[in-house]
Amino acid sequence: GDNHDLWVNPKDGNIMVQSNDGGANVSFDGGRTWSSQDVQPTAEFYGVWLDNAFPYNLYMAQQDNSTYIVPSLNAPFNMDAVKTGPGCETGPIIPHPSDRNIIYGNCKGQFYVQNVAAGVTKAYWIGGQSLYGNDGGDLIYRMQRTTPMATSPHDPKVLYYGSQYLHLTRNNGVHWEKISPDLTAFPKCCQGGSGSPITR
C-alpha cells in the first residue's frame, strides 16, 4: 500500500521497481508480474528496539506490514530466521527486559502481549475502547498512532504506556494504573473528528 515511486529502466522498459511504504517490488516483464517485498532488504521502520540476548535480536515495526523480530547475526540474510511479533505497523514492539518469552506490542492504541513459549498473543484496549470512528473529545484515553511505550529501567515488571495520561502495568497489561494528570493542552478546537468521512 501507499505507493510512492515507479522507476523504469531507461535501457529496458521491462525492468521496473515500484516503491511503497512496505518496501519495493521488482518486475522483469513490464509489470505483468512483481516480486514479493521479502526478496530484497528494503523497508521503512517506525523504530527499532533491542533485547539483552547475546547475540541480540532487533524488534521492528515495519510500515504497512507488521512487526518483526530479527537476529542480529543473520548473515547471509535468512528470511526463515525472521519472526513476526505482536502489534502492527505503527509499533512499538518491545521485549520484556528479563523474560525473553514476553514481547509487548502496540497497534494504534491497542496493547498486545505475546508469550513466545506458549505461542499466544493477547490484545487489550486500555480504557476498553477502539479509537476508530470516534471524535477526540469522546475518547476516555487519546492515543497517538505510535503510542509511547517503555519498560522501567528500575523494575522489569513495570511497563509504561502513554495516552494523554501516563499509565503503568505490573502484570503484562492485565491491569493498568493511571499515574499522571492530563499531560496535554487539548483545546476545544481540536476535539472533533480527524480526516474526512472516507478515512473515518
PLM regions with names:
Residues 1-200:
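Beta-propeller blade termini and top-face loops
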